[in-house]
Amino acid sequence: VTPLPQSGNPKPRMFRLPKTSGIINRMGFNNDGVQACVERVKRSSFYQNGGVIGLNIGKNALTPMADANSDYLICLRAVYEVASYVTINISSPNTKNLRQLQNSQGLEKLLLELTQERALLSEQYGKKVPLFLKIAPDLEPGQIFEIANLLERFEIDALIATNTTISRENVQSEIDHHQSGGLSGKPIKDLSNH
């Protein structure tokens, strides 16, 4: 979910790769905005009956990268009351330049701001909502090490490994292998588990 509604990328934006059991998607965080999301969650019987609600937060496509942290903070504040956990998605290949947040300097600042805000929200709501970080499978070992150190330093509760890849290794035989977007499914099993 993003602060403001956005329609995502133009259709078609999902392509099945039947020979290799993969999917390429370029959805682009299509959603109705964080306020509509929270209202929908509050109305759901699943939430009302104590179901576990995980919410994935990201930045709007039109938000400049210099203001990306503000989008994450807006979303965290809005979803905190209803979330069982919050995923900080910095790894979608379908939002221009979003993966830049995976570099250690950008990520350090983002995690500092989010964990400081979580501390304030924890006092306000009387609960500490776990924060998860979702990373790309395309990272180099050194980047993974830097991210792991930041996760430990800022006491991030979990790591979601991984989002989709921009690699097209192992799917060259597919008609739609050239489509832009993130590849998921069986073709990235080894990459996401390295």
Give residue ranges: language-model regions.
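Hydrophobic faces of well-ordered beta-strands that scaffold small-molecule active sites
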Residues: 1, 25, 53-57, 86-89, ...
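Generic structural signal for well-ordered alpha-helices
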Residues: 34-45, 72-80, 104-115, 144-149, ...
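Short beta-strand/loop segments at the ligand-binding rim of alpha/beta enzyme cores
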Residues: 49-56, 120-139
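Active-site glycine- and acidic-residue-rich loops that bind
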Residues: 60-72, 99-100, 106, 132-152
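A gly/proline- and charged-residue-enriched helix-loop-helix capping module
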Residues: 2-49
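Loop-centered beta-sheet repeat module
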Residues: 70-122, 134
